[in-house]
UniProtKB/Swiss-Prot annotation:
Recorded name of the encoding gene: rpsJ
InterPro entries linked to this entry: Ribosomal_uS10 (IPR001848), Ribosomal_uS10_CS (IPR018268), Ribosomal_uS10_dom (IPR027486), Ribosomal_uS10_dom_sf (IPR036838)
Protein name: Small ribosomal subunit protein uS10
Superkingdom of the source species: Bacteria
NCBIfam families assigned: PRK00596.1, rpsJ_bact
Entry's Gene Ontology molecular function annotations: structural constituent of ribosome; tRNA binding
The keyword Flavoprotein appears for this protein: no
One GO CC annotation: ribonucleoprotein complex
Any GO BP annotation: translation
PANTHER family: 30S RIBOSOMAL PROTEIN S10 FAMILY MEMBER (PTHR11700)
Stated role: Involved in the binding of tRNA to the ribosomes.
């Protein structure tokens, strides 16, 4: 018999908000009696944008900006219906992107 598993991937630009959200999910799942693996930190994506400082000249003078996307992975092993219901009711910040795979 195959074990049922829910995999949750969290993404956010702010790692403090991401860690708080992951902690909320882990506490909620443990309260309902399911096993949790994680949160596992995944590699951070770093996007770098280079633009010219001046609108007309000085190609040598440039400025760089970056956006870091932090990611976490949480596995819920053998979830109960109570676990799924508690996760549906969980209120997480708007800055955290959540992907759930069954």
């Amino acid at each position: 018999m195959q074990r049922q598993k829910i995999r949750i991937r969290l993404k956010a630009f702010d790692h403090h908000m991401l860690d708080q959200s992951a902690q909320k999910i882990v506490e909620t799942v443990r309260r309902t009696g399911a096993d949790v693996a994680g949160p596992v930190p995944l590699p951070t994506e770093k996007e770098i944008y280079t633009i010219l400082r001046s609108p007309h000249k000085d190609k040598d003078s440039r400025e760089q900006f970056e956006i870091r996307t932090h990611k976490r992975l949480i596995d819920i092993l053998e979830p109960t219906p109570k676990t799924v219901d508690a996760l549906m009711r969980l209120d997480l910040p708007a800055g955290v992107d959540i992907e759930i795979k069954l």
